[in-house]
Curated annotation (Swiss-Prot):
Subunit structure as annotated in this protein's UniProt entry: Homodimer.
UniProt name for this protein: Pyridoxine/pyridoxal/pyridoxamine kinase
Residues noted as binding Mg(2+) in the record, renumbered to the chain: Y136, E162
GO annotation, cellular component aspect: cytosol
Binding site for ATP: D125, T157, E162, T195, H221, S222, R223, V224, T231
Keywords, sorted A to Z: ATP-binding, Kinase, Magnesium, Metal-binding, Nucleotide-binding, Transferase, Zinc
Functional pathway: Cofactor metabolism; pyridoxal 5'-phosphate salvage; pyridoxal 5'-phosphate from pyridoxal: step 1/1; Cofactor metabolism; pyridoxal 5'-phosphate salvage; pyridoxine 5'-phosphate from pyridoxine: step 1/1; Cofactor metabolism; pyridoxal 5'-phosphate salvage; pyridoxamine 5'-phosphate from pyridoxamine: step 1/1
Length: 283
């Protein structure tokens, strides 16, 4: 009779630099399905915690899956601590969340985790919706972000629409967007990266605005017309990777934007509807 082998030696536990909490698809390149390989290309280790598990994005003619049950979700988080797999943890990132209850569970886990990791970087991408689609998450998620995750985050990466929802302010011009972002800053929340600020349509530019208490930096990139999904998830993966590799915030944002453009163009060259990662020149 065979006996079950138990891995009880926690000194042998696999360690990660980042825990990435967001969506996962079986087919496609969104959420952790693009973030994890992008982070690994940067030479960092990552644990992926799914919030929803889907066959693909809803942009296909068939679509299956849904939110991870709370019991499973909390268990995924708890298991990382039970296995002593977080000794070297440096950052937690969040993307698409399936339910408001997941946000509350995650916030409780992060609060406890920070007691052992006081320097932990928490970066929140408050995925709520966009100008074209409006809110495409459950209606109680914006308040859950405000109540539970924003007070824990050091940095957030909303688009213009999400910034408006979180602050209740109109952000359709640069000055109002900057003012809204500054209204969110606190002793904990040190910076806001607005990922779709008003750009120059005539010059085919888009702007990313980095807002902190003492500075505002506007970074312009070429605009690529595309229907590709997952570019925001890729941007956040590149941003957190750059920060953990020692890049200053503005430099990390700039490099993340350039990498997203590179990936989009590479994907278009290969005539794919899903992002394809080319080799990273500098790991």
């Amino acid at each position: 009779m065979s006996s079950l082998l138990l891995f009880n030696d926690k000194s042998r536990a696999l360690q990660a630099d980042i825990v990435a909490v967001q969506s996962q698809v079986v087919y496609g390149s969104v959420g952790n399905s693009i973030a994890v390989p992008a982070i690994k290309q940067n030479g960092l280790n990552v644990f992926a915690v799914p919030t929803v598990l889907l066959s693909n994005t809803p942009h296909y003619d068939t679509f299956y899956g849904g939110a991870i049950p709370d019991e499973w979700f909390s268990g995924y988080l708890r298991a990382l601590q039970e296995h002593d797999a977080l000794r070297q943890l440096r950052a937690v990132t969040t993307g698409y969340m399936g339910t408001a209850s997941q946000i509350k569970i995650l916030a409780e886990w992060l609060t406890a985790l920070r007691k052992d990791h006081p320097d932990l970087l928490i970066m929140v991408d408050p995925v709520i919706g966009d100008i074209d689609s409006g809110i495409y998450v459950k209606p109680d998620l914006p308040e859950a972000y405000r109540q539970y995750l924003l007070p824990l985050a050091q940095g957030i990466t909303p688009n213009i629409f999400e910034l408006e929802i979180l602050t209740g302010k109109n952000c359709r011009d640069l000055d109002s967007a900057i003012a809204a972002a500054k209204s969110l800053l606190s002793d904990t929340l040190k910076w806001v990266v607005i990922t779709s600020a008003s750009g120059n349509e005539e010059n085919q530019e888009m702007q990313v605005v980095v807002v902190s208490a003492d500075s505002v930096n506007v970074i312009s990139h070429s605009r690529v017309k595309t229907d590709l999904k997952g570019t925001g998830d890729l941007f956040c993966a590149q941003l957190i990777s750059g920060l953990l590799k020692g890049k200053a915030l503005n430099d990390a944002v700039h490099r993340a934007g350039l990498r997203v453009l590179e990936v989009m163009r590479y994907t278009q060259q290969h005539e794919s509807d899903e992002l394809i990662l080319p080799p990273l020149a500098e790991a």
